[in-house]
Curated annotation (Swiss-Prot):
Pathway: Metabolic intermediate biosynthesis; acetyl-CoA biosynthesis; acetyl-CoA from acetate: step 1/2. It holds the Pfam family Acetate_kinase. The active site is at residue 143. It comes from Mycoplasma mycoides subsp. mycoides SC (strain CCUG 32753 / NCTC 10114 / PG1). It catalyses: acetate + ATP = acetyl phosphate + ADP. This is Acetate kinase.
């Protein structure tokens, strides 16, 4: 069995996978409000469990998870868990998932300056598991690793080169675990070897990015040094003129940290629509012809379309355009609006297919479409499980 952990500052999402025959999750859970007034909940065999517990820290939360797995006889002993895979947001220039050694843990620590909101929580969880399960192999799967194949011309910024040499200022990109899963799944769907696969993948969730996949590898992506760059998102601005920060700081007598917080937490769909960070709520107002909601949706769609056209220019041929993540998988209206904006590629959507229910993936383009368009449900936890399994064998 493989335990997959995604640790946040006050929560731990986890899945337990049975890997004996196929790779299937047998338990899906969440430890929430760690350090506040915590509780643990999970689902196993269609039965839901919830346990109130103070959960003073991450170690206590992981101990409770393991205790409940034993109590409920989901596992008979801890050694049945062969490996633990962790989602780590930032790995700097680490290019692949890695067994967690002291050296790898040190590199994750070094990347805290690049992901101060995310990496510390992963480090705490890793140290807790190391203490509670000292004989179990641990693997770190990095959201940045997949994009380490980008050429220098795509990852360097047009700033003094010493900023890269001294401070690591470059494009890293994110959502890499999701992109890796989508590349593998697309290879299977299209019956084409990964190394021959050219895709444009739109990972549209509350956080959103696009990746240009050339010969099965990341060639360019929209997020940058941090997840703030690129597309307009739920609460993030995406790309803006950086001088806006200095201008607003002077106008409002506000420090740069507060401005960055606003760009991360109060911008994007929420900032422009003044309705919500949730695309479903914004689309409700869009249907009612609310002016700000209409502008927000049109802006969102336009930016995604612009990136698709930009990335199409990198590729000699495109095997598919793929939509994934919360909005990409579920918002048929957004998929349709984006494809209509990409006039150069002649993406033709079949409305019946686009609106049809599906479980895993579906083709949403019509026979007239120059390029096939798919909606594919991503599965980052399964990807982490597979990477963990491959590394600990």
């Amino acid at each position: 069995m493989i335990l997959v952990i995604n640790s946040g500052s006050s929560s731990i999402k986890f899945k337990l996978f049975d890997t004996s025959k196929t790779i299937e999750p047998i338990l899906d859970g969440l430890a929430e409000r760690i350090g506040i007034d915590g509780f643990l909940k999970f689902e196993h065999n269609n039965q839901k469990y919830k346990f109130e517990d103070p959960l003073p820290d991450h170690e206590h939360a992981i101990q409770l998870i393991l205790n409940k797995l034993l109590e409920l006889k989901i596992i008979s002993n801890i050694d049945e868990i062969n490996g633990v895979g962790f989602r780590v947001v930032h790995g700097g220039e680490i290019s692949h998932s890695s067994i967690i050694t002291d050296e790898i843990l040190s590199k994750i620590q070094d990347s805290v300056k690049l992901a101060p909101l995310h990496n510390p929580a992963a480090i705490i969880a890793i140290k807790a598991v190391k203490k509670l399960m000292p004989n179990t192999s641990m693997v770190a799967c990095f959201d940045t690793a997949f994009h380490q194949t980008m050429p220098e011309v795509n990852y360097l910024y047009t700033v003094p080169y010493k900023w890269y040499e001294e401070f690591g200022v470059r494009k890293y990109g994110f959502h890499g675990i999701s992109y890796e899963y989508i590349v593998n799944k697309s290879s299977e769907i299209l019956n084409k070897k990964k190394e021959n696969l050219n895709l444009i993948v739109c990972h549209l969730g509350n956080g959103a990015s696009i990746s240009c996949i050339k010969d099965g590898k990341s060639y360019d992506t929209s997020m940058g040094l941090t997840p703030l760059a690129g597309l307009m998102m739920g609460t993030r601005s995406g790309d803006i003129d950086v001088s806006i920060c200095e201008y607003i700081a002077k106008q409002t007598n506000t420090d740069i940290f507060s401005i960055t917080q606003t760009l991360n937490k109060q911008s994007g769909l929420l900032g422009l629509s003044q309705v919500s960070a949730d695309m479903r709520d914004v689309l409700e107002q869009y249907d009612r012809n609310d002016k700000k909601a209409v502008v927000a949706v049109e802006k969102y769609v336009q930016i995604v379309a612009d990136f698709i056209v930009k990335y199409a220019n990198y590729l000699d041929n495109i095997d598919a355009v793929v939509f994934t993540a919360g909005i990409g998988e579920n918002a048929d209206v957004i998929r349709d609006l984006i494809c209509k904006k990409v006039k150069l590629l002649n993406l033709q959507i079949d409305q019946d297919k686009n609106q049809a229910k599906y479980s895993d993936y579906k083709l949403i383009s019509s026979e007239k479409s120059k390029i096939p368009v798919y909606a594919i449900r991503t599965n980052e936890e399964k990807m982490i499980c597979l990477d963990t399994l491959n590394l600990i064998k």
